[in-house]
Amino acid sequence: PGMKYKHYAPKAELTLVEPAMEDKKASMTQEQVECMVSMVWKLAKEQIDAGVRVGIICTDESRAAYPEGIVRSIGARKSQESVAHNLYGVLREFDDLKAEVIFSESFGEDHLGQAIMNRLSKAAGYKIVRV
């Protein structure tokens, strides 16, 4: 029970990074997004510097914040349809590229965001870092 979307789980350990939000149904503020992106990069860079093959799940808007690693955008943050559509394929791609750990940005749980976060949370085994 509760693992209906276990097939989304990549072989690598996935950590989801999300801002501490009182209202998860709200969209993230620009400040929250920037704080989250900064933490994803900090965590990823520590692993990259240690010689680990790191995957990073980001959005089109934050792609430039990640100069190293196996970086994959799953679409524009405002286009939840494309993010939802691309999620499974990106997770499988990290398997093909032999990522050892993956860090992912999170999404507000408005509209399709709730389904996206549900799948990401389950794929991460509920390993979440809140910033």
What feature does the model see in each segment?
Residues G2-G125, V129:
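A C-terminal functional module that forms or caps the active site or interfaces directly
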